[in-house]
Amino acid sequence: MLPYNSNYLSDNGKRKFSDENPQSEVYGSSQTGLPSSYGNPQSYGTPPVQQSSAMYGVNNSMGGGMYNTSENTQFMNTDYSQTSSYASTPMSNAYSRDAPAAINNNFGYSYVGQSSQPVPSYNPLPSYNTASLPNAGIPAAMPGMPSGYPGTVPIPQGGYNAHYSSPYNNGYPIGAVNPTSAIPAQPPAQPVNNVLPSYVRSNSRSSARSTARSAPRSTQRSRSSSANPVTTPPVNNTLLTPPAPPVELPPVTTTSPNAIIRSVQWIRSFVPQAPIHQVINTLAQTKWDETAALSILSQKYLSCDLGIPIQEHKRFKQSPVASNMPTYGSSNRTVQSQKRSIRDKYIQMPNDSTQASLMPSYTRKTSNASKKLTTEEDEFYDSEEEPEAIVHRDTSALERTVLNFINSSTAKELSDTASCPLSHSKLLLEHRPFQTLAEACIIKHPDDVPSKPGRRGRRREKNPMGQKIVNACMETMEGYYAIDNLIAKCEFLGNRISKGMASWGIKLEMSNGELNIVDMESVPTEAADNSDFPKFVTEQPKTLASDVQLKSYQLVGVNWLHLLYQQKLSGILADEMGLGKTCQVVAFFALLLEQGHHGPHLVVVPSSTLENWLRELARFCPSLRVEPYYGSQQERANIREAIEENEIKYDILVTTYQLATNNKEDRSFLKHQNFDVCVYDEGHYLKNRMSERYKHLMNLNANFRLLLTGTPLQNNLKELVSLLAFILPNMFDSDMDDLDVIFKAKPTADADIEQALLSKQRISRAKTMMTPFVLRRRKNQVLNDLPKKTQIIEHCKLSENQLEIYNRYAALQKNQQLRRDDKRNKRSKNDEESDGKSLSAGHVLMQLRKAANHALLFRKFYDDEKLKQMAKDIMQEEQYKNANEQYIYEDMEVMSDFELHRLCRSFPTLQSYTLKDDPWMDSGKIRVLKELLPKMKEEGSRILLFSQFTQMLDILEQVLDTLKISYVRLDGSTQVEVRQDIIDQFHKEEDVTVFLLSTKAGGFGINLACANVVILYDCSYNPFDDLQAEDRAHRVGQVREVTVIRLITDNTIEEYIQKLANTKLALDMSLSSDGKDREEIGERLVQDMLDEENNGNNTKPEITGNESDGEFKVSSSNNSKQTDAEETNTGVPLEGSQPNSVEKTDLADGDEKANIKTEMKSETVEGDNKELRETMKGENVQTDSNAAVPSSKSSTEEPNESVLSGHLDLDTEASPVVSTIEKTTKGDVSVTEEQQSANIDGQLEKPEIEESKKPDVLNQVSLSIEEEKPKNKESEVDNNAAKD
């Protein structure tokens, strides 16, 4: 039996199984057991073998004493350094060097099903291999020997070599010689071709090295005695001729020696009677098929066929799990992994001599040692100089201002300014007028409870209500003064920019708060020559690539950036998405490079756009040396070390927001680079001055800061000041403490503090002051040839499974609404209970959205009994053998049907539990897609399919597989290194029809202009997210008309979300807060809609109010035209909820997790404050081509001068973008919109829709906004902005 994983065939395997060799005349010389040519000590020094304690002539190679000769070297085992005697038997040598210690059976192991079993061994006798008689190699009747074992016939003895005195090997063992012939002593003959030529491992190691390693030390000392260290047996040597008949073997070209040895080993474990040469011959005949050879040999020696059971055994036990499972077809073409890192793909080699001669010499900007080093105490001061001391105003003057304000303000204004309840401000004003602030400070609230005793029994005096209000007003007023002071400073700086642009012949209009210079026509060819300002650059930089041609508005943008840079100021480039902001920035870098400004510069981008930036920089300006600062922690450490040691020289360093802010080492490295220009892509990430991201990035030193954003500036004083503080940090250092008082103020239950901050006068001044620092152009202004964008709403119906699930959660929401109404007045006093109920309410809203999407997002098909059986069955899998069955069952309980289906497809033991009959096709929206997608594919359209939920993307993958439509996918879990590869794949492979994207990860910063259809499978609470997704296709480079299709499920929560997005209120909301705040507010508004519908007996609510001052109220309309058929489909009426804390984990996240919490309080108060209660009555639609959006009775009114609400005073002069909503094939009424102001700023004109033209459509009623007198506020919102 063969030893496991050994090369015992180092002798037997090299025999030429042929009788063609001539017979020798004489045996080897006396006492050698070998022919004289192999064993003559006179010719070759020493005997080739030595006495061994191992049985049957296997030499104990560890004992040393062996000498190498040119003939016997080939019989060494080079793998185990084992030198066997020439005719060693096929058995295990437990004493050989490097042989496995566990293999100590005389005949090795029998391997059956990968488990070793000993084979019966020979009965050891003391006379074995001692060979006291010359011909006693192995006796013919050895006990314990398997029947049919070859070579048990005594071997005749020939002549002896007197110089060879080995007492143990006087005779030839089994199969070593032909017992019918004798071999004369002769010199070595020429080597012959080996039957297994690959045994000589010339490819893996040299023969000399193999020989030197396998031979004992004495052999190495006498190496010079052999001219040829490795040879093959002589041609005329018949010692290699076995008793078996010869078989011509095909040449072995693909089977390695080790593989053949393992095959022989495995076959003989089943059929030990088969001779080794017979096994090898059979393997050669079957082309080295182990199972086929075993089948032949087992039938010959065992009279049974072992091939069939062995084949089944190997297939199940040795093959991968996937081979035992059904093959599931997939149309997924997504790139799975990258071949190179981002740095390897985009790092640039040093420029050649030609390019270098055109550019100025590289100079590295070094820090000044004399300057103050930034420490942890002053890390939030961006300037390296000592910050100026904060100068406070005269306290007496501030007190007089506050006193006058208290004596003249209304209760609501005082409540907003002091952040106190409205009832407290009313009580204070009942005692006015006040002569001094001391009189106001002593006013107490009648319900004030005396303070509790302290530890030592003393009572702490609580501040009276009046003193709290006075202190809060003084802090707020001081913040107002700081803002006014900053606005005055910014106006002074802005005048410098205005003069510089005036030198070009451009007259600025300061009314809109932003520049909108479009083309070169407004720039005179010969502007006034002013040495204080740079000249207008009329030609693009020469270092730009030859195939890059800047448009006129882009060249204007480069000049504007250059002007700000020369004046040592900063700015915000806020062009609409798709207008080439990246190209303008690269051209600006190229212009600086031509002027000798090598930086270093920094570009901070979102993770999803990192590779796109690197590609654009390399494409637009190859002369720039760009270094990506991205990778693992060790890779970044290597980059830092190389840069600090000046081994890497760069002009631009590109990194991500996450790396620039999260890790301390990264922050410290970037902080000390002393950048010249810092560019922040998606600059709206920096609107929250209290976020950690803002603070860390403010710490980066830079001479010029540029924010890029497609998001418009908003009528939010906190955001405007935050952006100003970021781009002009030196100016804001001394006033930040005063500003923090305003920023940290929390809204009350009665009113939002922003209602006091967002006065018309201050907003107007702030935006006027920011005008020179903000450049924004819109698509309709610069791209007259941009294809139009068509909006289509596809109405879908709930399937039976969806309807059942939806009604269940709608009923649950109704019960929660009733419980909340009972405890409405106690919510503010019992926060813990309120928090718990609100979490459930938010969970129900999420479940309603999921039910409107697909039933497989829930667990219905897999009941508890089936899950228990599945948990039991999966325990048979290898990776679950040691798992806890109960834990597995509990994990399965929280999984959806589709997640369980995918789990079943992954394991052979669960194949029977997979879903049958394609239930993923059973959904209202999927039915619509089933009709749309094949038609679009035939037309050659390419589709972007967005969804908020990653689980929904999983289901859509299965749908596309069923429809045989190829696709790629990108979501928040996609590796950053692969994202650009997937985008490139979609661009290049035109046969890929669909691109699946999550709205968060795929809706920002990527260019997919090769697609002409955008399908929004579900809508976001934040309408701006959907607009961003649309602009992935409707952008520069698009040559086809773009169609945007929204899938809306009738009579569900999605109708409310869509109606919210179509109102001016929603647009105001989207422009007055951060992204997370927008989702929070949107969710709260939808909840209020549902609440109003339920409270009004299922009547449709109506928004009324004064559009001009941004105030809205809620009223219920009884003009509902809902039919019985509609109520049947709707099921249980929806009940809204106002959660205190809603945590959403189901949404598909992009580079950040969406962990959104919204806190709301509801308290009924009295007063003449205005209501801000949002619900929706319905949406007007019209088939006339001139109708655009829901009607607004006050849409033609001019805005008032004062806006005290938190909503934007919209610009009604914005040019519209042509957008047409066509009628769908489903028979649903849709809207045709002409001249809809659908730009990103949310400036939406709402033309009047005549009553006579309003169609009678189910679930769609008019939205009216009208003025009303202020009423009591019944519902207030406490929105704590989540950190960016």
Swiss-Prot record:
Ranges of compositional bias, category Acidic residues: 376-388
EC number: 3.6.4.12
Keywords of this entry: ATP-binding, Chromatin regulator, Cytoplasm, DNA-binding, Helicase, Hydrolase, Nucleotide-binding, Nucleus, Phosphoprotein
Taxonomic superkingdom: Eukaryota
Subcellular location(s) per record: Cytoplasm; Nucleus
Ranges where the record places region Disordered: 1-57, 185-252, 317-339, 353-388, 446-465, 816-839, 1088-1284
GO cellular component terms attached to this protein's record: chromatin; cytosol; nucleus
Residue ranges constituting the Helicase C-terminal domain according to the UniProt record: 928-1079
Composition bias type Polar residues, residue spans: 1-10, 20-57, 320-339, 353-372, 1095-1107, 1180-1194
GO terms, biological process: DNA double-strand break processing; positive regulation of transcription by RNA polymerase II
Ranges of residues in domain Helicase ATP-binding: 562-730
Functional description taken from the UniProt entry: DNA helicase that possesses intrinsic ATP-dependent nucleosome-remodeling activity and is required for heterochromatin organization.
Protein name, entry field: ATP-dependent helicase fft2
Native source organism of the sequence: Schizosaccharomyces pombe (strain 972 / ATCC 24843) (Fission yeast)
Encoding gene, per UniProt annotation: fft2
